[in-house]
């Protein structure tokens, strides 16, 4: 799967920023839980959003996240999102995509979730997001909640 994710990351990174209404980068951290176990998680993401209409947008992001546990590695993700502007400073969205395996014995998984971004000062924003990971292959699904801070360009 890495053969597909890395070219996608590169293509988004080199996409013409002038076409984007909202290019952003963020750092985030939170918790991920599965099967009665909760661990910390942290990472970073970069993405672009495009206005579809005055109050709706769609976009995509690439990410790298790490579960704070020995034996895990960076999990890379590609996510699409669609949302509404709930005012001049707030975005509410649903998201879905794919995340690579977070450990050598794990598998990559599809994910879906929802979140909110709130502008706080100039280009800075705060973000909260929930994701459900559809793990499959007899491995219990997992869930995460993260908060982050980002900057729009």
Language model features with spans:
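Cleavable N-terminal export/targeting peptides
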Residues: 1-24
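Gram-negative outer-membrane beta-barrel domains
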Residues: 17-153
């Amino acid at each position: 799967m890495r053969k597909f994710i890395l070219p996608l990351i590169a293509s988004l990174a080199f996409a013409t920023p002038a076409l984007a209404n909202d290019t952003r980068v963020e750092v985030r951290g939170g918790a991920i839980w599965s099967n009665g176990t909760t661990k910390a998680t942290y990472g970073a993401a970069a993405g672009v959003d495009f206005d579809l209409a005055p109050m709706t947008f769609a976009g995509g992001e690439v990410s790298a996240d790490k579960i704070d546990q020995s034996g895990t590695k960076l999990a890379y993700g590609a996510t699409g999102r669609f949302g509404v502007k709930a005012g001049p400073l707030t975005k509410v969205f649903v998201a879905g995509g794919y995340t690579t395996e977070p450990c050598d014995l794990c598998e990559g998984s599809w994910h879906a979730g929802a979140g909110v971004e709130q502008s706080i000062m100039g280009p800075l924003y705060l973000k909260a997001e929930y994701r459900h990971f559809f793990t499959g292959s007899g491995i219990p699904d997992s869930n995460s909640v993260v908060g982050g801070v980002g900057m729009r360009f």
